[in-house]
């Protein structure tokens, strides 16, 4: 019996409608900051952009405030593919590629403009490239401002740091920096820092304006010292296991979303940093603005020593030489 063209067409359409649709990819994004921190705003923005640019083919579920783990755990979770994305400090990546701890060196960048200029160079890209062989892809650099001390006693000179226990990230460079300044660097998980300050496990810590305000560290410390001793980038990292599952079109969309997040975060950070400095002035006993020269002098030898240990002497020389242009 001969089928009519209409019947054939109807049959074909019915058959095609039964073909399984390609499953949506769902990936988790793990952040460590509270919901009202600029990092959290930018993470939410990234998720929205990925959904938009992939037309819903990829859904990013965003978790904040260490819900899925702290920064150290997030690095490993990205590597093994348990989570797809995270925002981590470059310092946190030293556990995978030790050279990334170069970013923790004190007074490495002359100012914000110098910092962002370097991140756009081939030298910065070369520093990050080995991470891919370790299961991590960098999609963008995220602003995290300059780092300053918040303590129980006023820090006006390096001498004031002698004997002080200062919380740092799990970074050998940061521990050695505190030693050069006369203090003891004590690695403490971010989620545990408030209690550590409250109970005297540490005498102080260091971080940027928005992070100090978001976690209300002014409730458990009295003085904030604007020494700007470090400027360490946060990074948007992605699991290479997830990356390798994507089509070329999807890879481009996710990479574009990462660059959009980088730009968005710079704007959000500027707004938050200005606002939060006023909050710090209102809540700390005193905002100390020290002469930076003694701090720079105290750590000058450390920069070269750590550069040699990390195998990044040429990169450090490149950065230090470029300071004159800023």
Q: What residue spans do the PLM features occupy?
A:
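Bacterial N-terminal signal peptides
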Residues: 6-17
């Amino acid at each position: 019996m001969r089928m009519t063209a209409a019947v054939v067409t109807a049959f074909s359409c019915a058959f095609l409608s039964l073909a399984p649709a390609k499953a949506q990819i769902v990936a988790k994004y793990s952040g460590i900051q509270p919901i009202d921190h600029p990092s959290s705003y930018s993470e939410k923005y990234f998720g929205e952009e990925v959904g938009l640019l992939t037309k819903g083919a990829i859904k990013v579920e965003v978790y904040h405030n260490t819900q899925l783990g702290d920064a150290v755990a997030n690095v490993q979770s990205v590597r093994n593919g348990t989570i797809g994305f995270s925002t981590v400090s470059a310092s946190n990546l030293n556990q995978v590629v030790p050279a990334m701890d170069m970013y923790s060196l004190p007074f490495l960048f002359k100012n914000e403009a110098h910092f962002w200029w370097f991140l756009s160079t081939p030298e910065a890209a070369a520093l990050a490239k080995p991470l891919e062989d370790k299961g991590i892809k960098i999609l963008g650099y995220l602003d995290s401002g300059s780092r300053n001390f918040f303590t129980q006693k006023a820090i006006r000179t390096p001498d004031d740091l002698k004997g002080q226990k200062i919380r740092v990230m799990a970074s050998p460079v940061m521990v050695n920096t505190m030693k050069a300044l006369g203090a003891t660097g004590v690695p403490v998980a971010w989620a545990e820092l408030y209690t550590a300050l409250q109970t005297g496990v540490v005498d102080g810590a260091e971080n940027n304006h928005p992070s100090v305000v978001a976690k209300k560290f002014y409730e458990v410390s009295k003085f904030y010292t604007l020494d700007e001793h470090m400027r360490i980038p946060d990074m948007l990292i992605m699991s290479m296991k997830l990356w390798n599952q994507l089509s070329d079109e999807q890879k481009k969309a996710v990479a574009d979303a990462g660059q959009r997040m980088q730009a968005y975060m710079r704007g959000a950070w500027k707004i938050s940093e200005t606002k939060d400095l006023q909050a710090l002035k209102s809540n700390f006993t005193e905002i100390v603005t020290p002469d930076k020269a003694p701090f720079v002098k105290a750590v000058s030898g450390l920069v070269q020593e750590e550069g040699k240990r990390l195998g990044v002497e040429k990169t450090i020389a490149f950065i230090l030489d470029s300071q004159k242009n800023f």
